[in-house]
Regions:
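N-terminal secretory signal peptides and thylakoid transit peptides that target proteins
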Residues: 2-18
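Pocket-edge positions in alpha/beta enzyme catalytic cores
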Residues: 2-3, 83, 123, 165
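C-terminal segment of N-terminal export signals and the immediately downstream linker at the start
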Residues: 21-45
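Short alpha-helical segments and helix-capping/turn motifs at coil-helix boundaries
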Residues: 27-30, 90-94, 131-133
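Short, solvent-exposed beta-strand-terminating loops
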Residues: 46-65
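Aromatic- and Gly/Pro-rich amphipathic surface segment
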Residues: 62-97
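Substrate-binding cleft and catalytic face of glycoside hydrolase catalytic domains
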Residues: 97-167
Length: 167
């Protein structure tokens, strides 16, 4: 029997388990009670293609993952990141979940096709604005943003010219 769990339900369950056991509660983790040192960083990590969705919004260009996942037979069930977890539209809620779970950091990657839709040339400011708003919200909630500059998400047009190493 296969049971499908929605991301928010899974996260809520994990947070509940951690907080009910005191693992993430300030009385344990923040004071370094011997389980974890006081300076231990509790965080979460995501990959832009796996969570953002909104692949055709705000002038985002096609990425190598768009090309790969839309090629028949490459991904089980033909799944794509077209919608994914819809983080692009639900990032406020996602940051609130991190904050309510007493995390202290969030590591995220950039979708370069959202910033440089064609791999070179003009910067798409709506892409930068998205990440700017995300960082502002993280800081406002007391979460330390950790930016991963590259996690295998490249504009397809740049890949067709040889990737990062092209002239």
């Amino acid at each position: 029997m296969t049971i499908l769990i929605q991301r928010r339900g899974l996260l809520a369950t994990i947070f509940s388990l951690f907080t009910s056991k005191g693992v993430l509660q300030g009385s344990n983790a923040a004071k370094g009670d011997g389980i974890f040192p006081a300076d231990f960083v509790w965080g979460a990590s995501t990959s832009s293609y796996q969570i953002e969705g909104a692949v055709e919004e705000d002038a985002r260009g096609k990425s190598i993952w768009d090309a790969f996942s839309h090629t028949r037979g490459r991904v089980k069930n033909g799944d794509t990141g077209d919608v994914a977890c819809d983080h692009y539209h639900r990032w406020h809620e996602d940051v609130d979940l991190l904050s309510s779970g007493n995390f202290t950091a969030y590591r995220f990657s950039t979708a370069w096709s959202r910033i440089l839709p064609f791999g070179t040339g003009s910067i798409e400011h709506r892409g930068l604005d998205f990440y700017d708003r995300l960082v502002d919200r993280l800081l406002a909630k007391g979460l330390r943003p950790w930016l991963c500059l590259y996690q295998w998400d490249l504009p397809q047009t740049l890949q067709e010219r040889g990737g990062w190493l092209c002239d």
